[in-house]
Amino acid sequence: MTAITLSNINKRFGEKVLFRDYSLHIEAGEFVAIKGESGAGKTTLLNIIGLLETPDSGSVTLCGARSPSFSSRAAVHLRRHKLSYLFQNYGLVDTDTVEANMKLATRFGKAKGKAEKERIADALAQVGLSGYERRKVYTLSGGEQQRVALAKI
């Protein structure tokens, strides 16, 4: 199943053309690395995929829903329920515990007490960090910190 399709995307900033008839297909479960020089358009590409920016022309299809028909409400729904975006800065409080950082994420704030602890434990298990709840973030490796950030989303 195709999760993300960009079809004939065009994007420019003034005279600078970032994308000309650019197309991309990403299947569900597929991992893709995006690399390029500074100013090449990597962030713009991710912003287009994340519905944070619109291309000048072309279409974006996410989980079967096709732009440009995305209303603001539909885009918000897709961003909340179908997309995850991990920034280069993980946004963790390094002097706090993993559990305290997890509680800052709104998806865990809805559950309280034992239910909240179980949701946090499940999310950490999914990223291979079972039992890390009481560890201080600054004691974790960069990769472990990244996995905590992934577990939060």
What are these regions (language model features)?
Residues 4, 19-21, 78:
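Conserved structural motif at the start of ABC-family nucleotide-binding domains
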Residues 35-37:
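The feature captures the beta-strand-to-loop junction immediately N-terminal to the Walker
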Residues 50:
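Helix-to-loop junction immediately C-terminal to a conserved catalytic motif
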Residues 58-69:
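Conserved ABC transporter NBD signature motif
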Residues 66, 114-132:
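Conserved ABC ATPase "signature" region
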Residues 67-84:
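ABC ATPase NBD coupling module
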Residues 95-105:
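Short coil-to-helix segment of the ABC ATPase nucleotide-binding domain corresponding to the Q-loop/switch region
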Residues 136-140, 144-145:
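Conserved ABC ATPase signature
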